[in-house]
């Protein structure tokens, strides 16, 4: 049908009539931007979401056709989730990204195991902390301590003692237990299988967000004058770990398997150079009888991020070694 507006006026800038052909409903593309030329369309014409627009230069037509074909091919190969994350800006936005976006996040079943087993299983896993501005901090766990519950004289739950302070130790596996020491430092624990049992996270190998960790540590230091903290000093201790990740009492009793500000991810498998895990006495345990020297602290041998190295435990007779998850070797005492 002829274009509306009558004949074009002569002279400079005159409008030329354009022939427009509407496609049948069955040939309409699903949405703008993924148009495909119907079989009855003229070569060299541009097809939009709803109609065919008149003749256009052949080189431009070919370029547009090639671009649309590449787009269509890529969209067919992507999952809906991949298409969402490939949209510019969405990958970094805290509103379009959540812990569920991390396929390696460890669920509640991971934490539902005895304290000693969980303490060993933690090694090599990655602790993630998301700050309010969307910044994510990551660190690989390299040192833990197991506390076995009421029978353990060094545990806060010894004798079955349950108070508002240690309630997190008696909640479901994966619950955070954060407590204050010396009136100014925090320690991060995770409840395990068994009432009153938990695992203390002692040290991390910083992986992501090191400068932010350094700033957080410096903001809480008594004196910021002098040398800057080295990378190995950022998370080499339970309280340093909490400072570097901005973890305080407000995290107490949160669910590590469900929380949107802190969670645990699978660590990378490094089977090419498996680590050796040492079992040694826990740190700072006094007046706990035989429990003082029980080898319930576990750390990756040779890691520069471990808080305290036990040379005696490392130099004992060659222990039996068995493979475990994440490519680590466990030293059996």
Curated annotation (Swiss-Prot):
Compositional bias of kind Low complexity: 1-14
The keyword Cytoplasm appears for this protein: yes
Gene3D superfamilies, per the entry: Methylpurine-DNA glycosylase (MPG) (3.10.300.10)
Keywords, in A-Z order: Cytoplasm, DNA damage, DNA repair, Hydrolase, Mitochondrion, Mitochondrion nucleoid, Nucleus, Phosphoprotein
Catalytic activity: Hydrolysis of alkylated DNA, releasing 3-methyladenine, 3-methylguanine, 7-methylguanine and 7-methyladenine
Activity regulation description: Binding to SSBP1 in mitochondria inhibits glycosylase activity in the context of a single-stranded DNA (ssDNA), but not a double-stranded DNA (dsDNA) substrates.
A Gene Ontology BP annotation from the UniProt entry: base-excision repair
InterPro entries linked: Formyl_transferase-like_C_sf, MPG, MPG_sf
Subcellular location: Cytoplasm; Mitochondrion matrix, Mitochondrion nucleoid; Nucleus
Keyword Ligase: no
EC number per UniProt: 3.2.2.21
Ranges for region Disordered: 1-42
HAMAP family named among the record's database cross-references: 3MGH
Subunit structure: Binds MBD1. Binds SSBP1.
This protein's name: DNA-3-methyladenine glycosylase
